């Protein structure tokens, strides 16, 4: 029963994640946390694998159909590659940071409370920015070193929180690179792909992969790919303003789940 429920959550989250460019993990992680039936490290790993599968499909399809002449790819290599490189480095740092914070608490649930609290604050800030973004003057960074630093910050946060990416990716891309919604969504998935790849590789190399139900992982990964396929298709057809509305509604839901999780972990 729980495997079926997890698959439904992963598929739905991956569809929405592919549409909005937030990866899906920002939904999967807090929702699975709310059920409170798996260890935090297991949820982080399974969520990361699902997000990686979804972004892998999205990025590969984007590169295949994305010759600049076709106009279908919105990833600019000049900024996209250093962002991805920074995200890869950040993925390693975020993974290490999570284990460091976890080691500070005898009760692992307290580490979950820290994650939920940070995600709540980040999502609230993202919501405020999204609502008032028309009044905010944005930047247009193109320097490679700056792109690497921005990517590293995003990669660190996503790996530490176990969410793959999340709304913060889009806000950072809006502000620092003056991207529109759909361009930011595609570049966000590109960043998430590299961040999650290095995080998962690091887990394998350091032999820190937690014990988990293999069948559940297989189903979640398949749902991640299926959700990515459907979400990418829907994203092409939806107007940018509808993507914005979905994004705002999603952030409100995420904040409510985070509040519940903080109360649940600390209660």
Which residue stretches match the model-derived regions?
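Juxtamembrane transmembrane-helix boundary motif
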Residues: 1-14, 33-42, 60-154, 205-267
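Transmembrane helix-bundle signature of multi-pass membrane transporters/permeases
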Residues: 14, 44-52, 88, 185-196, ...
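Short helix-coil transition sites and intra-membrane helix breaks within transmembrane domains
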Residues: 15-25, 158-166, 183
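Residue-level hotspots within the lipid-embedded alpha helices of multi-pass solute transporters
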Residues: 18, 155, 159-163, 196, ...
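Interfacial segments of multi-pass membrane proteins
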Residues: 28-42, 168-183
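Central hydrophobic cores of alpha-helical transmembrane segments in multi-pass inner-membrane proteins
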Residues: 51-59
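Alpha-helical transmembrane segments of helical membrane proteins, especially in multi-pass transport
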Residues: 195-202, 206
């Amino acid at each position: 029963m729980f495997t079926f429920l997890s698959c439904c959550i992963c598929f739905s989250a991956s569809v929405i994640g592919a549409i909005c460019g937030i990866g899906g993990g920002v939904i999967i992680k807090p929702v699975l946390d709310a059920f409170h039936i798996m260890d935090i490290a297991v949820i982080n790993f399974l969520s990361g694998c699902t997000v990686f599968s979804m972004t892998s499909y999205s990025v590969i399809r984007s590169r295949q159909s994305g010759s600049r002449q076709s106009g279908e790819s919105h990833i600019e290599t000049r900024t996209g590659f250093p962002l991805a490189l920074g995200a890869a480095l950040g993925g390693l740092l975020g993974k290490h940071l999570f284990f460091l914070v976890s080691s500070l608490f005898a009760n692992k649930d307290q580490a979950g409370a820290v994650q939920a609290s940070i995600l709540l604050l980040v999502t609230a800030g993202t919501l405020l920015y999204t609502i008032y973004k028309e009044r905010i003057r944005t930047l247009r960074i193109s320097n490679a070193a700056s792109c690497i630093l921005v990517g590293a910050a995003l990669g660190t946060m996503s790996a530490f929180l176990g969410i793959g990416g999340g709304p913060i990716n889009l806000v950072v891309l809006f502000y620092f690179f003056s991207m529109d919604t759909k361009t930011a969504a595609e570049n966000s998935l590109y960043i998430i792909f590299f961040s999650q790849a290095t995080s998962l590789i690091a887990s394998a190399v350091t032999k820190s992969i937690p014990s988990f139900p293999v069948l559940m992982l297989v189903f979640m990964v398949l749902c991640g790919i299926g959700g990515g396929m459907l979400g990418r298709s829907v994203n092409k057809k939806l107007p940018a303003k509808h993507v914005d509305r979905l994004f705002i509604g999603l952030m409100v839901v995420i904040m409510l789940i985070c509040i519940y999780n903080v109360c649940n972990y600390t209660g």
